[in-house]
Amino acid sequence: MLKIDLHGFTYTKVKDILPEWLITNYNNGIDDFEIITGNSEQMKQVVKSICSENGFRAEDDWNGNSGSLLVTINLSLIHI
């Protein structure tokens, strides 16, 4: 699982870098990510929105840590 820590990033910077980071790493064969957001609910919402817009889904509290999100590809969007 690949991780990125967004502590210290502005919402604008996250909106600029995260979509490409997710897509590039997914295209390189990585299909699950831990995104460390800290406890900011607004940052979590920004990340969830970016994930949704780019075909990923983000889960809260997946490891008992409320400061990170588990991000995976949204399989319901894949048409076979």
Question: Where in the sequence are the language-model features?
Answer:
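Conserved small/polar residues in nucleotide/adenosyl-binding loops
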Residues: I78-I80
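Conserved helicase motor "Helicase C" RecA-like lobe of SF1/SF2 P-loop NTPases
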Residues: E41-N54
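Short beta-strand
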Residues: E59-N63
